[in-house]
Amino acid sequence: MSLNSLDLPGKSEDTRVVVAMSGGVDSSVVAGILKREGYDVVGVTLQLYDHGAAVHRAGSCCAGQDIEDARRVSESLGIPHYVLDYEARFREAVIDPFANSYVSGETPIPCVSCNQTVKFADLLQTARDLGADALATGHYIRSRANGAHRALYRPVDTDRDQSYFLFATTQEQIDYLRFPLGHLPKAQVREIAEELGLTVAKKQDSQDICFVPQGKYSDIISRLKPEAANPGDIVHIDGRTLGRHDGIVHYTVGQRRGIGVATGEALYVVHLDAANARVIVGPREALETHKVFLRDVNWLGDTPIADLPKSGMEVFAKVRSTRPPRPAVLRHADGQTWVELVDGESGIAPGQACVLYSDDSNAARVFGGGFIGRSEREPQAEEMLRRLMANADKASAA
């Protein structure tokens, strides 16, 4: 049997596709393209959080005006549209873990958790329940057949590359998902929106974390976890106490501005000692990292990760969403997975992701990745930090 444009067997008119519609231009264009190609399209929008503060806020997502925009687009395209209340699930799977992660001294990525649980688990099951053959989204990433399964690849428009946030997508999910925008540049997507007469053609892209009004994540975390605003010491990596802070929630590893102490030297946040409510600062050199240890690894390579050679596997790694993939070596032994960064990186924060690729081109395959559990700095800085943490543990035990 021949395959249609979504690599599914059969004619497009016999293929039902659920489109995850956020109310933005990207997912709206996906619905429009698939409808134009003759697919049986069903739009689904998730209400993920209390939209009171976001009803009229530009750059929000999945609340208030966005839901109305998705409804209007669906109506104009002549497709059924459903709004599902996932607010409780979103709080449980995304917002609470986000706050817990910050309290523990990490810098989490809620978009990964949202994709991993709410969008690509719960919504995917909803799509199956609706009898859909696939779930399509407006993410900028590509997938194509790889043997009996499908594999992920970076998009044509690398400025919009969302693969960093999709590393945790499982093989089962990848096989069911479709990403029609992966081969299109953003400018062309907006042109298509104009051609289709979509009311969201000029709508601003979503910004920051969707459930955080004005990007002030510290307000939400402090409300959910008041202990995150507990004051504590600002300590130099060499052991000197330099001042006080108003809660580790206001800091992240690599931060330079707004630290709250003036010593005449450039200082950066090197580590967040959540157990002792301390912000550890130091010179830029103390941020240099060549090795990161991963947890919750989602490996999408063809060879099982446990079967990697002792010499490791040459890959390219991204430790920030805004950075291009850089040369690295992936290793796995004794149940641990780590990545050695050939050129090093600065300011790597626990809780962030390390995503792995075959190369650094826009055709690179995504091999998955993991969350950064810890990193190793340059030997001198690593020893100073270990000594500082050990002394704190002794003081706490005394």
Swiss-Prot record:
<feature type="disulfide bond" description="Alternate">
    <location>
        <begin position="114"/>
        <end position="210"/>
    </location>
</feature>
<dbReference type="Pfam" id="PF03054">
    <property type="entry name" value="tRNA_Me_trans"/>
</dbReference>
<feature type="binding site">
    <location>
        <position position="138"/>
    </location>
    <ligand>
        <name>ATP</name>
    </ligand>
</feature>
<feature type="site" description="Interaction with tRNA">
    <location>
        <position position="139"/>
    </location>
</feature>
<keyword id="KW-0547">Nucleotide-binding</keyword>
<feature type="region of interest" description="Interaction with tRNA">
    <location>
        <begin position="160"/>
        <end position="162"/>
    </location>
</feature>
<feature type="active site" description="Nucleophile">
    <location>
        <position position="114"/>
    </location>
</feature>
<dbReference type="Pfam" id="PF20259">
    <property type="entry name" value="tRNA_Me_trans_M"/>
</dbReference>
<feature type="active site" description="Cysteine persulfide intermediate">
    <location>
        <position position="210"/>
    </location>
</feature>
<dbReference type="GO" id="GO:0005737">
    <property type="term" value="C:cytoplasm"/>
</dbReference>
<dbReference type="GO" id="GO:0002143">
    <property type="term" value="P:tRNA wobble position uridine thiolation"/>
</dbReference>
<comment type="similarity">
    <text>Belongs to the MnmA/TRMU family.</text>
</comment>
<keyword id="KW-0694">RNA-binding</keyword>
<dbReference type="GO" id="GO:0000049">
    <property type="term" value="F:tRNA binding"/>
</dbReference>
<feature type="binding site">
    <location>
        <begin position="20"/>
        <end position="27"/>
    </location>
    <ligand>
        <name>ATP</name>
    </ligand>
</feature>
<dbReference type="InterPro" id="IPR004506">
    <property type="entry name" value="MnmA-like"/>
</dbReference>
<keyword id="KW-0819">tRNA processing</keyword>
<keyword id="KW-0820">tRNA-binding</keyword>
<keyword id="KW-0067">ATP-binding</keyword>
<dbReference type="GO" id="GO:0005524">
    <property type="term" value="F:ATP binding"/>
</dbReference>
<feature type="site" description="Interaction with tRNA">
    <location>
        <position position="352"/>
    </location>
</feature>
<dbReference type="InterPro" id="IPR014729">
    <property type="entry name" value="Rossmann-like_a/b/a_fold"/>
</dbReference>
<dbReference type="InterPro" id="IPR046885">
    <property type="entry name" value="MnmA-like_C"/>
</dbReference>
<protein>
    <recommendedName>
        <fullName>tRNA-specific 2-thiouridylase MnmA</fullName>
        <ecNumber>2.8.1.13</ecNumber>
    </recommendedName>
</protein>
<keyword id="KW-0808">Transferase</keyword>
<comment type="function">
    <text>Catalyzes the 2-thiolation of uridine at the wobble position (U34) of tRNA, leading to the formation of s(2)U34.</text>
</comment>
<dbReference type="InterPro" id="IPR046884">
    <property type="entry name" value="MnmA-like_central"/>
</dbReference>
<dbReference type="InterPro" id="IPR023382">
    <property type="entry name" value="MnmA-like_central_sf"/>
</dbReference>
<dbReference type="Pfam" id="PF20258">
    <property type="entry name" value="tRNA_Me_trans_C"/>
</dbReference>
<dbReference type="GO" id="GO:0103016">
    <property type="term" value="F:tRNA-uridine 2-sulfurtransferase activity"/>
</dbReference>
<keyword id="KW-1015">Disulfide bond</keyword>
<feature type="binding site">
    <location>
        <position position="46"/>
    </location>
    <ligand>
        <name>ATP</name>
    </ligand>
</feature>
<keyword id="KW-0963">Cytoplasm</keyword>
